[in-house]
Curated annotation (Swiss-Prot):
The keyword Lyase does not apply. Expressed by the venom gland. It holds the Pfam family NGF. The lineage of its organism: Eukaryota, Metazoa, Chordata, Craniata, Vertebrata. Belongs to the NGF-beta family. Glycans are attached at residue 148. Nerve growth factor is important for the development and maintenance of the sympathetic and sensory nervous systems. It stimulates division and differentiation of sympathetic and embryonic sensory neurons as well as basal forebrain cholinergic neurons in the brain. Its relevance in the snake venom is not clear. However, it has been shown to inhibit metalloproteinase-dependent proteolysis of platelet glycoprotein Ib alpha, suggesting a metalloproteinase inhibition to prevent metalloprotease autodigestion and/or protection against prey proteases. It comes from Oxyuranus microlepidotus. Residues 48-66 have a biased composition (Basic and acidic residues). This is Venom nerve growth factor 2. It is found in: Secreted.
Length: 243
């Protein structure tokens, strides 16, 4: 009987010693630890993703110099505005650099200095010699490319804002106007050259015409007709005879 009791006690102790260990004592590399690592990695990835999204919603502040760009250069113009040929004028030019000189060599505002002007005039005289055929202009005019034109009058006589710089396809173009005006209202003491001062009063004056230019209307760019100087003409009137 006592032998049977000892046998049962030994079998019970062996059963307890051979029981499975708890998950708290699971060795590294076991499935329980792998699940925990995966969960921790997922939480870390989620934290990084949340931080990245937060950075996107709250970007870093821009530099002051980036915020102080010219208002005209920041206005992006739709390229479709330039697809219609009826909006183009030979006296309006959009360019990234100053236009070339006019044929009469009087558009000197874009030249570097007086020496450059003299060299250009001498070169032109050598290439195209001028022959004195007795032909003179009634009025002396000067033609120049005008830059930085900001104000003008439209076809209704109202003042409008002219765009100086145009942002087109990430390139900044300047709007130039080719204007012609009188050099002197009285090229000769009597008025216009070649006019009979005994019977006529005369003087030279600048006339204007309308060209399509890119203007600002609210916060949008639009085409409008504006006045610019385009010619110098002679105005005459008959003298009254005193009897």
């Amino acid at each position: 009987m006592s032998m049977l009791c000892y046998t049962l006690i030994i079998a019970f102790l062996i059963g307890i010693w051979a029981a499975p260990k708890s998950e708290d004592n699971v060795p590294l590399g076991s499935p329980a630890t792998s699940d925990l690592s995966d969960t921790s990695c997922a939480q870390t990835h989620e934290g990084l993703k949340t931080s990245r999204n937060t950075d996107q919603h709250h970007p870093a502040p821009k530099k002051a110099e980036d915020q102080e760009l010219g208002s005209a250069a920041n206005i992006i113009v739709d390229p479709k505005l330039f697809q219609k040929r009826r909006f183009q004028s030979p006296r309006v030019l959009f360019s990234t650099q100053p236009p070339p000189l006019s044929r009469d060599e009087q558009s000197v505002e874009f030249l570097d200095n007086e020496d450059t002007l003299n060299r250009n005039i001498r070169a032109k005289r050598e290439t195209h010699p001028v022959h004195n055929l007795g032909e003179y202009s009634v009025c002396d005019s000067i033609s120049v490319w005008v830059a930085n034109k900001t104000k003008a009058m439209d076809i209704k006589g109202k003042p409008v804002t002219v765009m100086v710089d145009v942002n087109l396809n990430n390139h900044v173009f300047k709007q130039y106007f080719f204007e012609t005006k009188c050099r002197n209202p009285n090229p000769v003491p009597s008025g216009c050259r070649g006019i009979d001062s005994g019977h006529w009063n005369s003087y030279c004056t600048t006339t204007q015409t309308f060209v399509r230019a890119l203007t600002m209307e609210g916060n949008q760019a639009s085409w409008r007709f504006i006045r610019i100087d385009t010619a110098c003409v002679c105005v005459i009137s008959r003298k009254t005879e005193n009897f």
